Each structure stands twice: as C-alpha cells, then as structure tokens.
Regions:
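Positively charged n-region of N-terminal signal peptides that target proteins for export
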Residues: 1-8
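Bacterial N-terminal signal peptides
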Residues: 8-19
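Sec/Tat signal peptide C-region and signal peptidase I cleavage site
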Residues: 20-24
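Extracellular ligand-binding/catalytic regions of CAZymes and related secreted enzymes
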Residues: 25-29, 34, 53-57, 190-191, ...
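Helical hinge/lid and interdomain linker segments adjacent to catalytic or ligand-binding clefts
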Residues: 27-37, 42-119
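A glycine-rich, often tryptophan-bearing local segment used as a flexible ligand/cofactor-contacting loop or short
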Residues: 89-160
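Structural detector of well-ordered beta-strand residues that form the stable sheet scaffold
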Residues: 106-110, 182, 222
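Catalytic beta-strand/loop cores that center a nucleophilic Ser/Cys/Thr
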Residues: 138-217
Length: 258
C-alpha cells in the first residue's frame, strides 16, 4: 500500500467512526407508560411489539414501562411521554410533581383512550391537561370517524371518513377554548344511548370530538379517545394516527399552515 493509499484508508476509517454514530442517531426519545388496569389489561401485549416496530420504522428511541418506576426519576431526557390506556391517577406524590415539572419545561404528552378518564378530585391538573372532563361511554360499537383538521400530523394517513369500532367516550365542556379538534364521530352511525342497565348515555350531538391537541402549561398535548381493544394495535392506519401525535408532541413540528 502506497503512503497516499494508506492515508486515504485511515481517513476513511476515521470518517466511519465519526459519521457512523451520527447517522444512526435517533431523532427523539419517548417514554410509553402502558400499565395494565381493570378494564384494559390485554392491549399492552399486542401494543408493545407494534410500538417497537413503530420506533424502528421512524427512528426514535422508546422506553416501554409496565409500571410507574420511570416517574421516580427526572423526566427531562424524554421528548414525549405516552400514557397508553394509563390514567394519570397511576402516578402518586412526587411522580405527579415530576410530570408537572416536565410539562412546564416544554415536554410533550400523548394521552390515549383510558388516559382520558381522569379523576378531577384526585388530580385536577391532569384533567385540565386532557382538556375535557370524562362523562361516560356506551357499549363498543362501529361508528364513522370524520377528519375535521387535515393539517395535523395525526390525521395525515387517515381517510376523510373512517369506519372504526371502539368505545365512544362522552365529555363535558372543555376547560379551554384553545383545544383544536382533529377528529369527530358521526353519532348517526351508532347508538350513543346503548349502555348498561342503570346507566345513562345520551351522546354529544353533531360535534362529538374523539381527538384533539392543545398547548397546556408550557407543554404540547395530543389526546385521542381511540384504542380500547387489543386488536386495534394491529391496525396500521391507527398506528400512524398515534405516531402523528407522538411526532408533534415530541418535536412541535408537522402542522401544515392553512
């Protein structure tokens, strides 16, 4: 090998050592809290490999948590935290304070399905983070979802009208006028009054939101009511819906200006 070739060879190795890790650098870091609970205990076994594949496909680092232990440490290293069928009430004491500090420092939160059922008497801050107080839901039924905001990443992969089977949550009035709804459900496509004996559900009328986003207390919050049954986590369109919310919550990017 000539001296010039040797120099070129050494430079190539040096470049590979420097450039290789940079090329493999993942774009952001996400904590997924998926804690089984009374009515949602089977979903996580299906969701975990689906989220792992999502992380590989979209090149982000994911930490999966079956319990609240990650909230015992500083959360600043995460760009977004996903409460996957996991209500805020799972967090206790200082864990709650760490989440509040994280959001106030500009962190992103994604709340999925069961996470929307907050208990205002236990943690009013988390219910305001969700944006609306939960009321009830009827039996699982098929309904038609309508995209009302095409400009948000969580709707980019969705058809304008989307046939979907889930629990259709009902809520009270929003805590803030700043909630930006991206999906609604057409109540004429299912029976909003079909509920267990002794309970009452009456729907929300023409404007029944199922997904929205807002900025709250310094952080970026994406909320979707979709995601009750385990089978839904095998649906590629649904997973793109979730990823769109994660992407925005983690980066603040992707909203198309009208």
């Amino acid at each position: 090998m000539t001296p010039m070739n040797k120099i070129a060879f050494l430079l190539a190795i040096a470049y590979a050592l420097v450039a290789g890790p940079a090329y493999a650098q993942q774009q952001f870091k996400v904590l997924v809290a998926a804690i089984p609970n009374k009515y949602h205990n089977d979903y996580a076994v299906v969701a975990k490999p689906a989220f792992e594949q999502m992380a590989r496909r979209h090149n982000f680092e994911m930490t999966w948590a079956w319990n609240t232990m990650p909230f015992d440490a500083d959360l600043a290293g995460y760009d977004a935290i996903v409460f996957l069928n996991t209500p805020g009430e799972e967090l206790k004491g200082e864990q709650r304070q760490r989440l509040e500090n994280y959001v106030r420092a500009g962190g992103g939160v994604v709340a999925v399905h069961r996470a929307l059922i907050a208990t205002p008497d236990q943690w009013p801050w988390f219910e305001r983070l969700i944006g609306r107080p939960f009321r009830t839901h009827p039996y699982i039924q098929t309904g038609v979802i309508e995209v009302v905001d095409r400009n948000f990443p969580a709707t980019f992969a969705l058809p304008y009208r989307w046939l979907w089977t889930d629990e259709w949550y009902e809520y009270g009035e929003p805590y803030s006028p700043d909630l930006k709804v991206v999906l609604t459900v057409d109540e004429s496509t299912y029976d909003p009054t079909l509920i267990w004996p002794g309970q009452k559900a009456e729907g929300m009328g023409k404007h029944h939101p199922v997904a929205w986003y807002h900025r709250f207390d310094g952080g970026r919050i994406f909320v979707t009511a979709l995601g009750h049954t385990p089978e839904l986590y095998n649906d590629s369109v649904y997973l793109e819906h979730i990823y769109g919310g994660i992407y925005w919550a983690a980066t603040g990017r992707g909203i198309q200006r009208k």
